[in-house]
């Protein structure tokens, strides 16, 4: 399980934290060498103080100097309360990150005009991924640290404190060393994860190191011990400057600005693809909000319009192939599973392999830690249940309808002219089946006429109690006249329901529209195929579209205007842009033999599925000249005398066909009609024989209108649409978002199973573990409380965003007071408490989020790419905003905002040196012998993780030594 998968190095680090904290709290009392360097400022003291100060919210716990036992009790209460507050912050931060995921997933529709004049509509994300990661995403993951710094300054009469800035620096150290060490270690042996957007990583890493270097400059170089207004404001304004630089790197706007580019509508997902090269000869125009933007105009490079480069194009194609493989393998792997289980497995696998944001991993980690379960599996199960339930509702809704529907089973019927009668089925569905229902029917002429082509029929059908199906018959009149296919109509009308039966058994019927009515179809069309002709053979249509996943394609060859005699029709496939021989389809040829009265046959062609996302290839299917089976011989005779002939059991043009008996010489009967040419030359025909010959020729089978069928092979529509849905990132916003307060309260009180270790896709619901129950009951108060936060559906996530950040600020104020009171209770300095305990508490959710991202994501960006950007944002927002407010306040009162440079400047310098080492090692790991920033051979993983953990321990150790004046700072 995720919650028990911390590495041994990280566990060892946690133990060392406690040892270091206890060591320095005792050294504080054992050592006598202390100095007082500041004036009333605690940062200048070399020892902690047992005397606590009033917090922003919490009062002082009196008396100030309790006994040793009371100190232990108080420290325990403060520590437990602080941990509980950290749990609360994690849960409300989960809601906060959900709102951010929804906000950054917003899309806008644009229209692409192609050079040929065609237009297509597609959607693009409003938020650039890099911009959202550095603004809302970073704010979401670092909100407690940022708000703690601001609240501490504003809550203590705009004076500088140690807790906020030290928490920011300590959190940065924890993120840079411990989180990256964990991510390096948890990747399976032999696997690697590389940073995909290396340019963005370089920019954010440089800004991260610069941010802490800048802190040292304003504290110790520019104006030692004083933060001026311009320094505070410039620190804050570095934040948007950093975002712009990262966006420029992501969009390649510096060097690439001077390279001509062209844009085309990409085949994948309808996205816009960027190409670099020569000036294009034609323009692709793009409409956004009604404005047309030319393809090579610089302003086209808007971050809101997510232009995809070829690299992304290839990645999407690979992802689609992977999705197609999953869809095909699931049914083969689990043929015994029911539809709900298969849907759940497919949804889970697809969601698991999607590219995810930092916000998603943070939400997933928090919910797994607090017993809320795996949101991907829960969403997949919910979707499966909805799909199955909708199917059941659609099939059962008619059965539960209170009104009986009366309708024909099908809207069209076909029959041959010699069939005698045609049967039509009437269905009764829904309503009270104990009633007796009457419905009238009546035939109506179409191209067929009553009396000459069919028998006029009308009457009433009675559905007795319990009966749901009735059959009516209409007589068909056969003649020997060649005719086109004809049709007539049969109408249903006048539905009546029997309310009661009289004593003599006669049913009394009345119109009750609330009990029964006509359904659809209430009119049936009957087509009569003429059987006096050998037939006209044709395809249904000249062009047909088939999916490449169809497997065996079946094409109908129709026999119209007659069905008399046995006829052979040859057929064959012809290559077009699609290739035969098993490449796109298998070559097929042969003959169709239509038996007497048979009106349709099918040709089967195997289509090869090569899993192309978009496909448009053609081949042709052609039928040849039809021939009667008997006319394949030299003579075709119509006989009405036996003589020296024997009956064959076959018919030609309505007459029995005879065959001459060998070794018997009889004169040719006078009634023989010859069709062979040799007899035409020797024997003139009478007018009667000529008429019979003409009729016989008219009855020969011929080809119809569509003798050549164009077959267009396309990608499977279901396959294409499914893949599009699976790979679309915005689905994750639906997974983490909520639609109603009811849904939120149900989630709050429900305990769910955490992560599976084996992930064996068993399809069986996993029961919550003991850990899940314990964490659920520990956090249920926070879950229910924060269920009152508006759902992410409202205001596109902004309502949830605003309320959540206010809640985080309130809890952070409590955490600041508890941490400060905990420190003074055990005489631990605020700076040490912040660097060790507070930084650790605020970073635990990020630790688990990075661990999940490192193991599940294809790249290292989601796990460690956000660390550097978050560190820079912490300084520019957390310290920049707080110090700007304080500096302006003091300047307005004619005072200076004093900040002791000692401990903070030393910590910043130490962190900066270690950060250079960290980034250098990560870049070295990209060499071929290791292959990426994360993972790699076991030895390399272990050495890297141990080095980073050692850097963090050294940072804690030296910062604590400096705080207690055992080594000299700045």
Curated annotation (Swiss-Prot):
Lineage here is:
Eukaryota, Metazoa, Chordata, Craniata, Vertebrata
Q: Chief subcellular site?
A: membrane
Q: Name one GO biological process term.
A: sodium ion transport
Q: Does the keyword Glycoprotein apply?
A: yes
| Function as written in the Swiss-Prot or TrEMBL entry | Mediates the exchange of one Ca(2+) ion against three to four Na(+) ions across the cell membrane, and thereby contributes to the regulation of cytoplasmic Ca(2+) levels and Ca(2+)-dependent cellular processes. Contributes to Ca(2+) transport during excitation-contraction coupling in muscle. In a first phase, voltage-gated channels mediate the rapid increase of cytoplasmic Ca(2+) levels due to release of Ca(2+) stores from the endoplasmic reticulum. SLC8A1 mediates the export of Ca(2+) from the cell during the next phase, so that cytoplasmic Ca(2+) levels rapidly return to baseline.
Record's protein name: Sodium/calcium exchanger 1
Residue numbers on the Extracellular membrane side: 33-71, 155-167, 223-228, 819-821, 893-903, 963-970
Domain Calx-beta: where? Answer: 393-493, 524-624
**What is the annotated localization of this protein?**
Cell membrane
Which organism is this entry from?
Bos taurus (Bovine)
Work out whether the entry's keyword set contains Transport.
yes
- Residue ranges for the region (Putative calmodulin-binding region) are 251-270
Modified-residue entries (Phosphoserine), positions: 282, 389
């Amino acid at each position: 399980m995720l919650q028990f998968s911390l590495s041994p190095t990280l566990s060892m680090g946690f133990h060392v934290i406690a040892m270091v904290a206890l060591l320095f709290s005792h050294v504080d009392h054992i050592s006598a060498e202390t100095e007082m360097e500041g004036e009333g400022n605690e940062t200048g003291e070399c020892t902690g103080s047992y005397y606590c100060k009033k917090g922003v919210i919490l009062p002082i716990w009196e008396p100030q100097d309790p006994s040793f036992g009371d100190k232990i009790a108080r420290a325990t209460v403060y520590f437990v309360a602080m941990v509980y507050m950290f749990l609360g912050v994690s849960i409300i931060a989960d809601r906060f990150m959900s709102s951010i995921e929804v906000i950054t997933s917003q899309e806008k529709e644009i229209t692409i005009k192609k050079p040929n004049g065609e237009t297509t509509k597609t959607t693009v994300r409003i938020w650039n991924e890099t911009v959202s990661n550095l603004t809302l995403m970073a704010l979401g993951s670092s909100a407690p640290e940022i708000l703690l710094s601001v609240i501490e300054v504003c809550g203590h009469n705009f004076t500088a404190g140690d807790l906020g800035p030290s928490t920011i620096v300590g959190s940065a150290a924890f993120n840079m060393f411990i989180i990256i060490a964990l991510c390096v270690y948890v990747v399976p042996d032999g696997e690697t994860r590389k940073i995909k957007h290396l340019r963005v990583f370089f920019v954010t890493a440089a800004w991260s190191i610069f941010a802490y270097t800048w802190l040292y400059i304003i504290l110790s170089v520019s104006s030692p011990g004083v933060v001026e207004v311009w320094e505070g404001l410039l620190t804050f304004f570095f934040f948007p400057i950093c975002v712009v630089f990262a966006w420029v790197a992501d969009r390649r706007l510096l060097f690439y600005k001077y390279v001509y580019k062209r844009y085309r509508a990409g085949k994948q997902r309808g996205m816009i693809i960027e190409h670099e090269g020569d000036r294009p000869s034609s323009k692709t125009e793009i409409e956004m909000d009604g404005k047309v933007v030319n393809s090579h105009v610089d302003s086209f490079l808007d971050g809101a319009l997510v232009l995809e480069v070829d690299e992304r194009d290839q990645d999407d194609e690979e992802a689609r192939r992977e999705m197609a493989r999953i869809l095909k393998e699931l049914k083969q792997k689990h043929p015994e599973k029911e539809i709900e289980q298969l849907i759940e497995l497919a949804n889970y696998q697809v969601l698991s392999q999607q590219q995810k944001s930092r916000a998603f991993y943070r939400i997933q980690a928090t919910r797994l830690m607090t017993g809320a379960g795996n949101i991907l599996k829960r969403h997949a199960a919910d979707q499966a249940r909805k799909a199955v339930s909708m199917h059941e509702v659609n099939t059962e809704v008619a059965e539960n309808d209170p009104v009986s529907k009366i309708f024909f089973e099908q809207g069209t019927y076909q029959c041959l002219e010699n069939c005698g009668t045609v049967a039509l089925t009437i269905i009764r569905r829904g309503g009270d089946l104990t009633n007796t229902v009457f419905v009238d029917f009546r035939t109506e002429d179409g191209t067929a006429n009553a009396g000459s082509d069919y028998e006029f029929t009308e009457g009433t059908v009675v559905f007795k109690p319990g009966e749901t199906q009735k059959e009516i018959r209409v007589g068909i009149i056969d003649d020997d006249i060649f005719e086109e296919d004809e049709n007539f109509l049969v109408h249903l009308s006048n539905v009546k329901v029997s309310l009661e039966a009289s004593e003599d058994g006669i049913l009394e019927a009345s119109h009750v529209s609330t009990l029964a009515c006509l359904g659809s179809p209430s009119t049936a069309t009957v087509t009569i195929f003429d059987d006096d002709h050998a037939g006209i053979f044709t395809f249904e249509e000249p062009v047909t579209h088939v999916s490449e996943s169809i497997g065996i394609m079946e094409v109908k060859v129709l026999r119209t205007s007659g069905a008399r005699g046995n006829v052979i029709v040859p057929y064959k496939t012809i290559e077009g842009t699609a290739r035969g021989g098993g490449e796109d389809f298998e070559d097929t040829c042969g003959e169709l033999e239509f038996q007497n009265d048979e009106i349709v046959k099918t040709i089967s062609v195997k289509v090869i599925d090569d899993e192309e996302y978009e496909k448009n290839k053609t081949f042709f299917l052609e039928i040849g000249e039809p021939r009667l089976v008997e006319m394949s011989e030299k003579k075709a005779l119509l006989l009405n005398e036996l003589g020296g002939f024997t009956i064959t059991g076959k018919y030609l043009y309505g007459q029995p066909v005879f065959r001459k008996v060998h070794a018997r010489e009889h004169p040719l009967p006078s009634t023989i009609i010859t069709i062979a040419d040799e007899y035409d030359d020797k024997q003139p025909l009478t007018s009667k024989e000529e008429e019979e010959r003409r009729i016989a020729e008219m009855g020969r089978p011929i080809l119809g209108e569509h003798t050549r069928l164009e077959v267009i092979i396309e990608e499977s529509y279901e396959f294409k649409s499914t893949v599009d849905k699976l790979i679309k990132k915005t689905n994750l916003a639906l997974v983490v978002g909520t639609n109603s307060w009811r849904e939120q309260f149900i989630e709050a009180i429900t305990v769910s199973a955490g992560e599976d270790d084996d992930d064996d896709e068993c399809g069986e619901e996993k029961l919550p573990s003991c850990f899940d129950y314990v964490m659920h009951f520990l956090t249920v108060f926070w879950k229910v409380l924060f269920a009152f936060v508006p759902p992410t559906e409202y205001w596109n996530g902004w309502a949830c965003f605003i309320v959540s950040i206010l809640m985080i600020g309130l809890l952070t104020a409590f955490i600041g007071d508890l941490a400060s009171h905990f420190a003074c209770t055990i005489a631990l300095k605020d700076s040490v408490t912040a660097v060790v305990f507070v930084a650790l508490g605020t970073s635990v959710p990020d630790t688990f989020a990075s661990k999940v991202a490192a193991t599940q994501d294809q790249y290292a960006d989601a796990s460690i790419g956000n660390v550097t950007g978050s560190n820079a944002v912490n300084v520019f927002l957390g310290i920049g905003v707080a110090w700007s407010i304080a500096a302006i306040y003091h300047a307005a009162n004619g005072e200076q905002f004093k900040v002791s440079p000692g401990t903070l400047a030393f910590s910043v310098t130490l962190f900066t040196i270690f950060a250079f080492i960290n980034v250098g090692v990560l870049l070295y790991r990209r060499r071929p012998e290791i292959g990426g920033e994360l993972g790699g051979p076991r030895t390399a993983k272990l050495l890297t993780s141990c080095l980073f953990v050692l850097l963090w321990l050294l940072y804690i150790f030296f910062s604590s030594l400096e705080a207690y004046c055992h080594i000299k700072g700045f």
